[in-house]
Regions:
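Intrinsically disordered, low-complexity regions
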Residues: 1-188
Length: 188
């Protein structure tokens, strides 16, 4: 009788094995090797017509490109993943990739695109009734506004975050956000 672990390993396609090897390389900080494995996995998944595999490998390639600051290539990968996820009706994954794209826009100085995406993300968190996600995104958006030279709008983000904390009786957090808003608007 075969070892169950070996049997399960034998049942996996080469593309799946390449993908898992890529994850291991990524975990160990070997991004060049990981990129190679994810690329091989992507080709294999495309040959197998494994839509989920294609999306997962493409997402990882996007992450690696973003880490390497190859923003255009990362956006291409993320846009492909979004297209696949939309076709599959997977709105949660689209939301996850939108957050990555917003960060990417902010990282490469495309402030207006980042701001618009973060505002949409806040709307989605509000629709999901997720105050923590809303506050975290408001905090990130405030940083983007500061980088874009829009200190008043950044202060508005902090005040909104403070009001959310106040609603949940988190007085200390609310005070901290109000202080940050005041500091942004204080004369230098």
């Amino acid at each position: 009788m075969k070892d169950l672990r070996l049997q399960k390993q034998e049942e996996k396609s080469q593309a799946r094995l390449d993908y898992e090897a890529g994850l291991e390389f990524l975990k160990n900080g070997e991004t060049a090797q990981a990129a190679n494995m994810f690329h091989n996995a992507l080709i294999g998944f495309e040959q197998e017509k494994d839509i989920n595999g294609i999306a997962n490998a493409t997402d990882k390639l996007g992450d690696i490109c973003a880490e390497r600051r190859d923003f255009d290539k990362a956006l291409q990968h993320y846009d492909r993943v979004i297209s696949i996820c939309q076709d599959q009706g997977d709105s949660i994954s689209v939301f996850s990739i939108d957050k990555k794209k917003a960060k990417l826009h902010a990282d490469c100085g495309k402030h207006e695109e980042a701001i618009n995406m973060y505002l949409d993300i806040i709307d989605q968190y509000n629709a999901m009734r997720n105050p923590q996600g809303t506050v975290d995104t408001l905090e990130t958006l405030a940083q983007v506004y500061v980088e874009a030279g829009k200190r008043e709008k950044a202060a508005d983000c902090y005040r909104t975050a403070a009001s959310i904390h106040e609603k949940y009786k988190h007085r200390q957090h609310a005070e901290d956000f109000m202080k940050r808003a005041d500091e942004l608007l204080a004369p230098v």
